Curated annotation (Swiss-Prot):
The keyword Phosphoprotein does not apply. One of its GO terms (biological process) is proteolysis. Disulfide bonds: none annotated. The gene is pepA. InterPro entries: Leucine_aapep/pepB, Macro_dom-like, Peptidase_M17_C, Peptidase_M17_leu_NH2_pept, Peptidase_M17_N. Its main location: cytoplasm. This is Probable cytosol aminopeptidase. It holds the Pfam family Peptidase_M17_N. Mn(2+) 1 binds at residues 279, 356, 358.
Length: 504
């Protein structure tokens, strides 16, 4: 369900066909805009609130039809709780409730009078951009493979306008929030759509072609596709081993964006996304329960693809390289086996103890490959370990890094976007779990601290630059109440991180 979003300083009378949405705090404390509407309707709202015992509790609502002396047919009053307790989470809750109520009520034109809400530490830019991404998430639906007869499942367009007071001198800043918000929302949908594609459609070839298509309509992005033969010539044997059992050859698409005003040779920021289009576990096969969800094992690559589209649209003054580590982990007579030993691009050898720990085999060779770019920062994004889901659930992505300042900056961006991350430790005690009797390193370190030992494995290949690892195994998709969908995380988080860097 697509959305159109804009801001306006025109009088609300200019939007007679829109449902006016305004708020009421606890104990019927009216917003300034609600007071204005009440006066225009000659006290109709205040008297109605008293008769209906409407006290402004959070998410309490009252939909008014044809208020007297008022030009709009619909007014939605939404409870916002106690004024002194209204926080950023309260704002998100209210927006979420409004959009869901309007969807159920078939209201498609919405005029929000909520910018006057005061939230400590958050300005109108945040409120507007956050409203856009929240509305986009609530309206998102993946129905590509459904035969649609039900009108409620069709792609209905929602038109949402946020009113900004005429006394607000930062209207252009609000317009920028719309531009940024719509670009991020579009990117989130791109990531979700890719993540939700079934693996018989979204093969390594499909992802490679999607990246190649970017150059057809975006001249700011340079595309390079490294094929299986080239990967072998380079010496990326760990990378190639992952897809050895698949009929689809491994591939490594690279997306380059160079807009740093200091020139194209300025050290780039590199994003690496794990793109296992289906992960059967290989010889160490996964349980059949929920194996269908292993189509989501390419959500890291989908996120990188989406972020590169966003930064190009926003024209961020940075040099950024996005790399999609794409393969399929299947079973055949050629598959990687437990006990095998691989020689990586770095020269380090790996003993394979579990073929279901395949993502790190892709990433370790890419982490070595990117040394040629002399990167400023490297961030890998991967649905890497079930252990991270056990540790952090579905609410937080796991962060592990070799740089404290970089980690703090990413944590700050996570608070800005409410796409939360939690930093986990990296130290030598965990590295001991990866010791091998016959190779330089084992590819797993036992059950304890699995998310951390996976990051410790990657750390051995990322010692020449500032590096962060995001384990999104718990946050990349949702699976509950018969609903399964990619979330698009951490697209907004990393986009905000890049926006923050671009302003330094």
């Amino acid at each position: 369900m697509p959305i159109k979003f804009d801001v306006t300083q025109e009088h609300i009378e200019s939007y007679p066909n829109f449902c006016i949405v305004t708020g009421v705090f606890n104990d019927s404390y009216l917003f300034p805009s609600t007071i204005q509407i009440d006066k225009m309707s000659q006290g109709y709202i205040s008297s109605l609130l008293k008769r209906n015992n409407f006290n402004g509790s959070i998410n309490q609502h009252l939909l008014l039809y044809d208020a007297p002396y008022f030009f709009n047919k619909l007014i939605l009053l939404i409870g916002c709780g106690k004024k002194n307790e209204f926080k950023s989470q309260s704002y998100n809750t209210v927006i979420h409730y409004i959009i869901n109520f309007c969807k159920k009520s078939s209201i498609t034109k919405i005029l929000l009078l909520l910018s006057e809400l005061n939230i400590d530490g958050y300005d109108n830019y945040w409120k507007i951009r956050n409203s856009i991404t929240l509305c986009n998430n609530e309206c998102y639906i993946f129905n590509k493979f459904k035969n649609i007869n039900d009108v409620t499942k069709k792609n209905i367009t929602y038109e949402i306008i946020s009113y900004i007071d005429k006394l607000d001198n930062n209207f252009q800043y609000c317009k920028q929030a719309v531009k940024d918000g719509l670009a991020i929302a579009k990117g989130l949908n791109i990531a979700k759509n890719l993540g939700n594609m079934p693996s018989n459609y979204c093969t390594p070839n499909y992802l490679s072609n999607k990246v190649q298509e970017l150059s057809n309509y975006n001249t700011d992005l340079d595309i390079e596709i490294i094929n299986e033969l080239q990967l072998k010539t380079i010496g990326m044997h760990a990378y190639l081993a992952v897809g050895s059992g698949s009929i689809y050859p491994a591939v490594m698409p690279i997306i380059k964006y160079q807009k740093n005003p200091k020139g194209p040779n300025t050290n780039p920021i590199i994003l690496i996304g794990k793109g296992v289009t289906f992960d059967s576990g290989g010889i160490s096969i996964k349980p059949s329960d929920k194996m269908d969800e292993m189509k989501y094992d390419m959500c890291g690559a989908a996120a990188v693809y989406a972020i590169m589209s966003i930064v190009s649209e926003l024209q961020l003054p940075l040099n950024i390289i996005g790399i999609l580590a794409v393969s399929e982990n299947m079973i055949s007579s050629k598959s990687l086996k437990p006990g095998d030993i691989l020689t990586t691009l770095s020269g380090q050898t790996i003993e394979i103890l579990n073929t279901d720990a395949e993502g790190r085999l892709l990433l370790c060779d890419v982490l070595t490959y990117v040394e040629r770019y002399n990167p400023e920062i490297v961030i890998d994004i991967a649905t890497l370990t079930g252990a991270c889901v056990i540790a952090l659930g579905n609410h937080y992505s796991g962060l592990m890094s070799n740089d404290n300042n970089l980690s703090n900056n990413l944590i700050f961006a996570s608070k800005q976007t409410r796409d939360y991350i939690w930093r986990l430790p990296l130290d030598e005690n965990f590295e001991k779990q990866l010791e091998s009797s016959c190779a330089d390193i084992a590819n797993v370190g036992g059950r304890s601290g699995g998310a951390i030992t996976a990051a410790c494995f990657l750390k051995k290949f990322a010692h020449k630059y500032k590096w962060m690892h995001l384990d999104i195994a718990g946050s990349a998709w949702i699976s509950k109440n018969c609903v399964k969908s990619s979330t698009g995380r951490p697209v907004e988080l990393l986009t905000q991180f890049l926006i923050n860097i671009s302003k330094i």
